[in-house]
Amino acid sequence: MGTCFCKDRIEEREPYLAPRSRRATVCERNSKNILAEQVNKLVLDTLAMIGSIVDNEQDPPMAMVCLHSIADKEAGWIQVVESMVDVIPMDHPLGPSVITLLLDDCPLPSKDSVIKVSKLFDLSMSGGEDSARHRNICVILGCMAEKLAGPSSVAILSKDTLHYLINNLISSPDLHVILFSLIALEKFAQTSENKATIKKKLSSHPVNPLYKFEALCSSESCLERQVGFCARWCLDNLFVSNERKYSYETVDLTGIEVMLNTRDVSEYLKISPDGLEARCDSYSFESVRCTFQVDNGVWYYETLIITSGIMQIGWATKDSTFLNHEGYGIGDDEFSLAYDGCRRLVWHGARSHAVPDKPCINDSTNNTERSMSQWESGSILGCLLDLNKMEISFSLDGVEVVVCTQLFEHAKSGFFAAASFMSFQQCKFNFGSEPFKYPPTDRAFKSFNSIAKLNPEEKIVLPRHLYLEQLRKLSIHEDSCTLCFDKRATVTLHPCQHRGFCVDCSKLLLHCPMCRSMIYKSEQEEISS
């Protein structure tokens, strides 16, 4: 009996290591622990400083530079991902956006590296009490699915990963985890094979889990509203069922005469079926203008701030350009002006101007104090355009924040309500179809909705795949503009000499779409009668 116990003990021992090997192992462990502590600190430093980046040409914070350097090697990349999962808190409004920014700027990982990370997460053990950790895991999975679309994305969506994300929808008690599980599933579904796999998994349940969340899209809770928006968007655009009508077929558009313009929007912005709510879940900076233009008088609209992160909301003319992949949006040229209530900045001509501090008020959500010029989820941003006095004013919850005049040095008319969105941001516009919460009391004004008129066809917000199918059926003339496919291509760009653009589209270009060279002059051809 004693011999048997000794035998068992010998088998259970760790393999013998020479003293030198043991020291090497201890050093490796210590080195890994030190690296983890350093990376944790760098991630938190980046999170703290990200709001101070106010210029696209500005050098990134040193913490970000160090993280990118560490992530150049596989072990470093894995450590950066682990640290983001472990240390980014739930209550920071830019937490998910920082994960997206860091992963987007890091070197593209290999499929094997991502699979290693998935195993480290131990996704077979779904659920758990650490909601922030699970939220961060879902954000990272979504980012990886977007960056590695195609066969690599299929490999990442293992049975454990799919079960983890679906199980979060069913059993997670935290709406943040549910929201980013939905977004991760959406990112994986960009690959057709994954889309079919996810759809099959959802249909295996007695009731599609997304159906119960769709009902939240009109909730008074901003977090529930986000979940409802994303669930409805997935059901309309990705996981379509014959049993369910599209939202545009059932939405009530009574009294809505101005909407966000689905034909004047950057490519990845999501717009609700009623045309009044917008959300960005892409890593790019997405923008949109409304359908109604104003040239004189005094005008006002309001925006419900659903997420408290970085958005630039205000006014723009048609000459304002959307350069979503370069990070330029409303307020980033001389033909637009916007307010960013997350960083408390006014944007114009790609330059920011800090808004003077207002007295602080208690933030009941986080038990902290915040400036009255800083928005939070549920805030109402008021945007007033006075073309009699040539001024624009912004207010938060009825309190004036700032008055601006600089836009009128470059534009006097042709203004649209407009906005740009960073990753995971959402808001709802009120152009007058509902009573305003905080209407101006110091001057008479008009709402867009009281003057504008849309016909029934113009009010339809089609799901993206139906819109693209509709475009494919259009007959295109040989001399049509290669950008809008609407007007005749009569412009030659100089000095590159590329052709194929109409007058209106050429005015929006800074670089040639063909060769990316700078445009110095556009020459219009004479049109023979």
Language model regions located:
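PRY/SPRY (B30.2) beta-sandwich protein-interaction domains
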Residues: 2-529
